[in-house]
């Protein structure tokens, strides 16, 4: 090992000594300085050897190396923005209010024009729903008739309770919409029904009185034959005692017994008739009560039906009035009328057709962008956004700036694009500046391109990423 180290030492020492000796005589080894004209008369091989090399190529090489070093340093230090590009449009934060009819209707009158400012509640369009006027008239007529019917049965109910017909007053305010013919008809029906009920009661009352008179007559016969039976009974006892004393013949005893039996039979017959009449009286009295009960029950049932019918008709009238009210379309908010689509009086509009759009006056202009699925993982609320309006070239009119306000949590399907996420962008201003210095106001619906700053990366990383990707993928095995 020592021999090896000694050999290496001697080797470097020899070169060191040689370099030192050459360094001492270095000036003697240089060629003498000659002028340019002296060098030109030297032989060619001496001219080539002694003429100094031009410094320009060396300087260019140094400059190239310096440029490469500076470029590498700048590429490593400098940062570029990572941008996700998303198409979209300008909108208002409160969402413009679309004005639509609730059903098919005819345009009766238009009160606004495109670009007009309207206040909340201001009438915009007057429509006539197909068949609404006829429905209202029909319902009002049915309701007036239902009120009369209710009054009819309420009056009859009062008459039943008081046993007398009250004054029929059909001139009250609630009946003002009823025709004179209907009022007279209801009055006649009330009087006719009350009279019929009274006649039925009178007939049953007379029948009851007749039965009562018959009862009194039969009762008198019963009393008569009860007395006759007692007398004949006493006679029979006396005849029987005389017969036992042999003071009376058997034929006379049998004759008296026959009279007693006849009196008893007559008494039984009249008592049976009396019981029958008492049952008849109970039946007649019950029928008399049932006449009133049935009549009252029928009146109450009809009154209940007509009260329910009136309630349903009131609801129907309210619904029809709401239909009429809905056909008078008013502004839901204060704002500006845009995209007015109806201009013809008498024209027909269909259900859910957009008639116009109201842009709220205090609305804030925003942008909505559709972020591609491949970029959504890097987009977050609060990130800076540059918005370029397609209508105005950004190189001449500039661009808008803003920040991500909200990102939808769920993707939506877009034709020819696939799944995208809707992002709302709050912008700093709602106008651009033209080359001549004029302010240009922007409006909802303008197409934009949003460039969302998702981060930064070095230029070197940007330049090497394709190479890195190629190398990484090329080293994979199938």
UniProtKB/Swiss-Prot annotation:
It is found in: Cell inner membrane. It holds the Pfam family HlyD_3. Residues 1-59 are cytoplasmic. InterPro entries: MFP, Secretion_HlyD_CS, T1SS_HlyD. Keywords: Cell inner membrane, Cell membrane, Cytolysis, Hemolysis, Membrane, Transmembrane, Transmembrane helix, Transport. GO terms for biological process: killing of cells of another organism; protein secretion; transmembrane transport. Residues 81-478 are periplasmic. GO terms for cellular component: plasma membrane. Signal peptide: none annotated. It is a single-pass membrane protein. The chain crosses the membrane at residues 60-80. Involved in the transport of the Leukotoxin. Belongs to the membrane fusion protein (MFP) (TC 8.A.1) family. This is Leukotoxin secretion protein D. The gene is lktD.
């Amino acid at each position: 090992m020592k021999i090896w180290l000694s050999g290496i030492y001697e080797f470097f020492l020899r070169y060191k000594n040689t370099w030192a000796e050459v360094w001492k005589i270095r000036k003697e080894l240089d060629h003498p300085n000659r002028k340019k004209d002296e060098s030109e008369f030297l032989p060619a091989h001496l001219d080539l050897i002694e003429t100094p090399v031009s410094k320009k190529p060396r300087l260019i090489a140094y400059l190239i190396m310096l440029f490469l070093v500076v470029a590498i340093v700048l590429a490593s230090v400098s940062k570029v923005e990572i941008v996700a590009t998303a198409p979209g449009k300008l909108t208002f934060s409160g969402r413009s209010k679309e004005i639509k009819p609730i059903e098919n209707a005819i345009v009766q009158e238009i009160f606004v024009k495109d670009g007009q400012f309207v206040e909340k509640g201001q009438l915009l369009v007057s429509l006539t729903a197909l068949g609404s006027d006829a429905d209202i008239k029909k319902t009002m007529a049915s309701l007036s008739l239902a009120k009369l019917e209710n009054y009819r049965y309420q009056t009859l109910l009062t008459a039943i309770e008081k046993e007398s017909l009250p004054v029929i007053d059909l001139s009250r305010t609630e009946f003002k919409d009823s025709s004179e013919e209907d009022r007279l008809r209801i009055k006649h029906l009330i009087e006719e029904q009350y009279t019929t009920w009274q006649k039925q009661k009178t007939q049953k009352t007379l029948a009851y009185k007749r039965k009562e008179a018959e009862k009194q007559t039969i009762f008198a016969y019963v009393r008569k034959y009860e007395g006759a039976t007692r007398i004949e009974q006493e006679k029979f006892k006396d005849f029987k005692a005389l017969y036992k004393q042999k003071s009376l013949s058997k034929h006379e005893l049998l004759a008296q017994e026959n009279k007693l039996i006849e009196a008893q039979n007559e008494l039984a017959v009249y008592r049976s008739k009396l019981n029958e009449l008492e049952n008849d009286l109970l039946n007649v009295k019950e029928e008399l009560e049932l006449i009133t009960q049935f009549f009252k029950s029928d009146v109450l049932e009809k009154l209940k039906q007509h009260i329910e019918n009136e309630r349903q008709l009131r609801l129907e009238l309210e619904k029809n009035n709401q239909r009429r009210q809905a056909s008078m379309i008013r502004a839901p908010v204060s704002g500006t009328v845009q995209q007015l689509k109806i201009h013809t009086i008498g024209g027909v509009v269909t259900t859910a057709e957009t008639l116009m759009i109201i842009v709220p006056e205090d609305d804030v202009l925003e942008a909505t962008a559709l972020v591609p699925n491949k970029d959504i993982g890097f987009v977050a609320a609060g990130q800076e956004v540059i918005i370029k309006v397609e209508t105005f070239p950004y190189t001449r009119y500039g661009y808008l700036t803003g920040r991500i306000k909200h990102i939808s949590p769920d993707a939506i399907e877009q034709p020819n694009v696939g799944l995208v996420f809707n992002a709302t962008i709050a912008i700093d201003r709602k106008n651009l500046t033209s080359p001549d210095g004029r302010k240009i106001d922007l409006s909802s619906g303008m197409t934009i391109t949003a460039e969302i700053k998702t981060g930064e990366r070095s230029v070197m990383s940007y330049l090497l990423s394709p190479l890195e990707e190629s190398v990484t993928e090329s080293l994979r095995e199938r």
